[in-house]
Amino acid sequence: MSACIVGWAHTPFGKLAGETVESLIVRVAGEALGDAAIDAKDVGEIVLGHFNAGFSPQDFTASLVLQASPDLRFKRATRVENACATGSAAVHQGLKTIAAGAARIVLVVGVEQMTATPAAEVGRNLLKASYVREEADIDGGFAGIFGKIASLYFQRWGDQSDALARIAAKNHKNGVRNPYAQIRKDLGYDFCRTESEKNPRVAGPLKRTDCSLVSDGAAALVLTDVETALKLNKAVVFRAAQHVQDFLHVLRGAEQDRKSTRLNSSHEIPSRMSSSA
């Protein structure tokens, strides 16, 4: 890769009262440029990652980044969306811009404001990232979809509740040391493993500690090429970046993967087919 991170900014994640999508964008964009010691006038392109899907009435948000500085006016700005990978998609777009030589400095911003939306509407909004034609009516919303995927996985590989609890416990332990984390409390393996009033089952085998929270927050990166980065105070070089996309109907794909794995484990399947799975 030929790109580096030379500046960054991050708000806490959680219920951020008094903030708006615009204020969050402006805050992290300005802080990231300041952290990089880069003048706004030197930015060649802006990429905003914003899923939205009904969380904010302001659907066109790319130009809101320009509010961070008058010197950003007339800069190229594009909004990208890729469901849960929206922020990563924005970074990938910035990397490709630099690799193509279309800009020397790219400002990448990711934002979401979810907590101001009623819970039922949050569920409907998130389901817009599913295959609506087949998955919009699943009980439990998006958690219900992942609950079904987890159930299919359990059918194939056995009960993995211990592994899920270890993952949740590890994440919460790391959150204690992260000043931006929404929950900074070490819940421990036993709490994450045990279904209880405070950790109820949400969907399928998934408990509350296995599911992500509704949150507000924003983050920003300043990307540049290696030559420019060497002239600045700090840089983190990208060693690699990959982007793959699966079928939108994730449940159908999960079922196909389960059947394929079962079939390919049979001795009756030719080795060529088995090796291609």
Would you name each region that the model predicts?
Residues 259, 263-277:
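Single conserved hydrophobic/aromatic residue that forms the stacking wall/gate
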Residues 7-54:
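N-terminal beta1-alpha1-beta2 module of alpha/beta enzyme domains
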Residues 40-50, 76-82, 106-111, 162-169, ...:
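Beta-strand segments within the central parallel beta-sheet cores of soluble alpha/beta enzyme folds
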Residues 22-37, 61-62, 90, 146-150, ...:
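Short, well-ordered amphipathic alpha-helical segments that serve as non-catalytic structural scaffolds
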Residues 81-112, 144-178, 221-227:
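Active-site-proximal alpha-helical scaffold in enzymes
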Residues 4, 16, 52-109, 113-145, ...:
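Conserved catalytic cysteine-centered active-site region
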Residues 1-22, 31, 132-136, 165-169, ...:
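Condensing-enzyme catalytic core mediating Claisen C-C bond formation in acyl metabolism
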Residues 30-44, 153-158, 230-231, 262:
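Phosphate/pyrophosphate-binding loops at sites that engage ATP/ADP/AMP, CoA/4′-phosphopantetheine
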